[in-house]
Amino acid sequence: GLFIRMDFVPVQMTIDGTQVSITSGYTDTSFSTDEILDLQLLDSLPDDSFVRSNGSADGHQLLGVFRGKKTGPCRMYVELDESPVLSIQTDEYTVFLTAPTKIQAENWYQELKDHMFDN
């Protein structure tokens, strides 16, 4: 677990007003909290076959733009050995996101949830 690839930048999520930004060293995504249709904290990625259209999948992490057979278009920021997985469904795509710690993931979930119901 001590081996860290130099290219891995921890994913960050920030919420500024209604604007949610997810940044990583590879690709960034932003959307408005108004666009969130569904928000879940999952134990792992859904059982689906995901095809990469623009991104990186090295067996440890999925990063970038993917399409799931059932899920449809998605944005992945997932370390495969991290749990839980935050699933944020917008009208355009679903974002899957893991955090470095379980607590961080739960905080992000709570923060998004609070913003969703502010509107």
What are these regions (language model features)?
Residues 2-33, 40:
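Conserved beta-hairpin
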Residues 34, 45, 79-119:
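Terminal and domain-flanking low-complexity segments
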Residues 23-30, 38-91:
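Non-transmembrane, membrane-adjacent beta-strand/coil modules in membrane-associated proteins
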Residues 5, 69-70, 102, 113:
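Context-gated lysine
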Residues 1-2, 107:
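An N-terminal domain-start capping segment
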